[in-house]
């Protein structure tokens, strides 16, 4: 009781803050479509150093306000995954302390980098802090899974191999990878990309390589070339159908792939955000400046993955 009272007192005078980091699928294999409509996936996932920012202030009612350059793209706050995640956790934790969330929306939406899922995961982490819950609390994990397929991996926000429908996470120690991320400011609905893949209910994709049994992963301290070799052997199975829906994705990949110092260019998730891993941070920054100059209306970020 004393601990709960202490947490309530602290939260009442001090807002809690967290970052919702962008998720990047370095590889993404679609193994098949389950009879329940979900797709079985295997993906090497990393997290970038760009993020939305979320704040929680104690209050008697659950609410959300959103600001930032992407706020007009967010839609109705009542449908936001932040609210959905909080409500799902409230169904599992008696007398859950919630309050007012404030979202600073920096990441593009419907972009293949888990923006909404990362926001929901950040909300769950904030609520865990406010209610003295461990991040591995089964109720928190279950709420994350029920919120969305990408929310569990975003809850951890650590590089990993993600399998199943996103519920199984195998740790993978990645080095810091210099990266440029580009979104051409077109939204791509995940359901449309999967539909374009054309898998029937219960259909398996015979012959798809299992990334878990891929060639041995390099040590974290291994040279960049070793990591590029393994990652380049992978693929994003959603890239081809996404390019059919939004051909500009192909243009982005071409620009990134021919940039000086680019070692690997690929689409993340269901698009339209693409990324390129570079030889060093200077090359990444130069490429980002070049893309921004040629396409000032695109979202461009130079940073690191890890």
UniProtKB/Swiss-Prot annotation:
Pathway given in the UniProt record: Isoprenoid biosynthesis; isopentenyl diphosphate biosynthesis via DXP pathway; isopentenyl diphosphate from 1-deoxy-D-xylulose 5-phosphate: step 3/6
Q: What biological process terms from GO does the record include?
A: isopentenyl diphosphate biosynthetic process, methylerythritol 4-phosphate pathway; terpenoid biosynthetic process
Organism domain of life: Bacteria
Where's the active site on this chain? 23, 150
At which positions is ATP bound? 108-118
Give the catalytic activity: 4-CDP-2-C-methyl-D-erythritol + ATP = 4-CDP-2-C-methyl-D-erythritol 2-phosphate + ADP + H(+)
Q: What is this protein called?
A: 4-diphosphocytidyl-2-C-methyl-D-erythritol kinase
Gene from which the chain derives: ispE
